Each structure stands twice: as C-alpha cells, then as structure tokens.
C-alpha cells in the first residue's frame, strides 16, 4: 500500500482540509508554519517512512520564518508557552516560535519583540531560504524516486520580487508543481464554487 506524506501550513493541517480526504495519508503539516519548517517535517517523515510513498507539498507564504527553541536558547524565550501545534519539531523535544505569518502568543508586547527579531531579515531573504529548502525537497524526492506534487495555497510565484529570489527560482523544477506554480489552490477553489469558512 502506498503511503501519502503531505506537508504545509493550516491550509493542509486544519481539520476538514484537502488532506483529510485522502486515504493512507501521513499529515505532518503545521498551522502557521512557513515552507522551511514544513519541508523539514516532510523530509524527516519521508526518511522515516518505509515502503512505497508519494509526497504532496503545499507551499505557504515563503516569507514566514520560525525560530527553533532548544536548550541553547530556551532562556531567551522563557515567557513563551508554545501551542501544541508548535511543539515536537520533527519528533524532538524542540518547539518553535512563529514570528511572521503566525500567532506566537497572546502577550502582544512579547509577540511584537519576536516579530521585530524575525523581521530583521528581509522578506526576500526569507523567501530565498524557503526556496532553497524547497529545492532540497525536490532533489531528495528525485534522488529517491519519490513522486512529488507541489502547489501554492494562496500566493504563487508571481508574488516574488527581487534579484536574488529570481536567481533562486531558476533552480526550481516547475514540472512537479500544479499549474507550474502560476496559480493557487485558493483561486481554483473559489472559481469552482467552494466557499471560505470565514
């Protein structure tokens, strides 16, 4: 039996998402996470899963960034109580705090401090690092003959600006992307009569 390993953000993680309609699915998506965290979770699960498998990967906002918390930096974030979906990064005792594109804490002052820390990196740098990780996922699947389908949740490649990100995008294999990365699943759902739950 073929196992289907899926990753992404809340678009894939939340109950009732597309991933919950697939049999034999192993869903390692994390709500609010960016592509780096999501791809890392998928890569680890692909290595740990034996037998036939395929991978479906939903790309969230490429400028999202998380900070992994372990014993080395735990004291810096000791006022933060992680949500369950932010714990056990790749099955470890580590957790992460989300700075951009995700809820970190109800303490607004602390949330602002984390966002300031994370956003010292430009959106382009965060996107570059995300697409480098997506390139790694593509290469891993190709090397191990694992069929891969990738798609954008709501932002497609047309939203990416900057000289460096344009160079990095040249290394992406767009043949494994739904609509070659020129459309989002959100737009397809709306065009086909699906309603937003909000």
Q: Language-model segments: what does each one mean?
A:
Residues 1-49:
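Serine-esterase "nucleophile elbow" of acetyl-processing enzymes
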Residues 43-197:
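Alpha-helical cap/lid subdomain in secreted, periplasmic
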């Amino acid at each position: 039996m073929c196992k289907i390993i899926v990753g992404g953000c809340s678009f894939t993680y939340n109950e009732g998402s597309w991933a919950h309609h697939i049999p034999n699915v192993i869903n390692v998506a994390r709500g609010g996470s960016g592509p780096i965290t999501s791809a890392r979770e998928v890569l680890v699960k692909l290595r740990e899963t034996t037998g036939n498998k395929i991978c479906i990967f939903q790309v969230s906002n490429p400028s999202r960034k998380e900070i992994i918390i372990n014993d080395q930096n735990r004291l810096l974030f000791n006022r933060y109580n992680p949500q369950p979906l932010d714990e056990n990064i790749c099955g470890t005792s580590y957790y992460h705090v989300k700075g951009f594109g995700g809820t970190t804490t109800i303490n607004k002052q602390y949330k602002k401090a984390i966002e300031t820390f994370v956003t010292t990196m430009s959106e382009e740098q965060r996107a570059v690092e995300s697409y480098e990780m997506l390139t790694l996922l593509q290469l891993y699947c190709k090397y191990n003959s694992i069929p891969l389908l990738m798609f954008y949740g709501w932002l497609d490649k047309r939203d990416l600006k900057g000289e460096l990100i344009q160079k990095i995008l040249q290394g992406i294999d767009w043949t494994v992307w739904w609509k070659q990365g020129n459309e989002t699943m959100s737009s397809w759902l709306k065009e086909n009569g699906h309603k937003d739950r909000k």
